[in-house]
Amino acid sequence: TDKYMHGILNKDWGLLPPKAVLSHLVLMEHPNYPKLLVYGDMAVIPLPEFKQKVAIVKYAAGVCKELGIAQPKIAMIAATEQMLPAMLACTEAAQIAKMSERGQVPGIVDGPLALDVAISPECAKIKKLKSEVAGDADALVFPNIESANVFYKTNTQLMKGVKTAAVVVGAAA
């Protein structure tokens, strides 16, 4: 991975355009989830700033559209689905969800959503959340690299039958 990323980031001959956002997305097939799931960033951006989160949403929507999902449902993951001003993940998720309502980002974006609410219809029902995304997410955007990486490793190391593919997005071809 280090050599691969070094080649992409090389200033003389690399593939990263100026001011571009490079990100890492995973496509996961999970035996306990009814459809493919796209998520990120789990390997490139340690603590995405707001503009980087918007870029990750756009990249995730693009991957979903390539998979034939015309209006991908994208969950902005946080520790809670409550709008807590003290938690940056919550406030930025709410802002990006509002951008989605206005057509400023692709897909149907909702957040903040706790992970259980994003992927479990039962949890969404118990918590009485009215959302097109809750319980039916096509993509998850995590607030930081730690949470995305733990999600990836928990699923790939503790679950049998999980299949993944990863891609670095944002580079020029």
What are these regions (language model features)?
Residues 1-133, 138-143, 147-173:
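Anion-binding alpha/beta catalytic cores of soluble intermediary-metabolism enzymes, centered on
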